[in-house]
C-alpha cells in the first residue's frame, strides 16, 4: 500500500495497472485512460526474448535500438507522442481544476516516454526506467509556461523497499 490516499488514480485500460492500483490505492476511484496503454508490440506481444532471439524481425528491431515499428505494432516515436499528448491533457485538466495532486499509475514504457519528454533533469528514454512497483514524484510548477515537470523523488512500493 502506498503512503498516501489519492481520491482518483488514472490507469491505462490494460488490466495490470488497475490490479496494481487496487493494491497501492485501495480507496481511490480508478479512471481508465486508453492513451496511457503500453506500446503495442504487435507480433512480439506476449513473447519473451528467448522465444524471439532467432526471429529476424525481432533482431532487426533490436538492432535499430527498438526505434523501428514492431511488426503489426507501434513505432516508438508514435507511442511516445500518444503518451505525452495524454499525460499533457491529464496535467492540464488537473491544473485547470485546481487539483494539487495528480496520480497516474502506468506501465514502464509509459513512464519512460513521459519522463523523457517532460522531466527535469533531462535524460533519455531508457535512463528513466523506474523500479518495479515504483515511479516518480514530480513538481509541475513550470508546466503552464514551459511544459516541464521537475523530479522530486523516485518512489517504490514493494515489500523489499519497505524493510
Where are the model-predicted features located?
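Acidic, low-complexity terminal tails and accessory targeting/binding regions
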Residues: 39-50, 92-100, 115-163
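ANL superfamily AMP-binding
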Residues: 1-5, 86-88, 92
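Short glycine/proline- and acidic residue-enriched helix-loop micro-motifs
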Residues: 59-78
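Generic beta-sheet signal
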Residues: 7, 98-108
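Amphipathic, non-transmembrane alpha-helical scaffold segments
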Residues: 14, 76, 80-84
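Glycine-rich phosphate-binding loops at beta-strand->alpha-helix junctions
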Residues: 110-114
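Phosphate-coordination/substrate-recognition cap region in phosphate-metabolizing enzymes
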Residues: 1-57
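Short beta-strand scaffold positions
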Residues: 11-12, 81, 105-106
Amino acid at each position: 500500500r502506498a503512503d498516501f490516499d489519492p481520491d482518483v488514480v488514472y490507469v491505462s485500460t490494460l488490466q495490470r495497472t488497475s490490479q496494481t492500483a487496487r493494491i497501492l490505492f485501495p480507496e481511490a476511484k480508478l479512471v481508465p485512460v486508453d492513451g496511457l496503454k503500453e506500446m503495442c508490440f504487435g507480433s512480439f506481444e506476449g513473447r519473451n526474448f528467448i522465444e524471439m532471439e532467432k526471429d529476424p524481425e525481432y533482431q532487426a528491431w533490436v538492432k535499430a535500438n527498438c526505434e523501428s515499428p514492431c511488426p503489426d505494432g507501434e513505432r516508438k516515436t508514435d507511442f511516445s507522442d500518444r503518451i505525452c499528448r495524454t499525460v499533457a491533457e491529464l496535467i492540464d485538466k488537473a491544473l485547470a481544476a485546481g487539483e494539487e495532486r495528480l496520480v497516474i499509475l502506468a506501465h514502464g514504457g509509459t513512464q519512460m516516454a513521459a519522463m523523457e519528454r517532460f522531466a527535469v533533469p533531462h535524460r533519455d528514454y531508457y535512463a528513466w526506467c523506474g523500479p518495479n512497483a515504483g515511479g516518480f514524484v514530480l513538481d509541475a510548477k513550470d508546466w503552464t509556461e514551459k511544459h516541464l515537470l521537475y523530479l522530486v523523488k523516485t518512489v517504490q512500493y514493494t515489500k523489499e523497499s519497505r524493510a
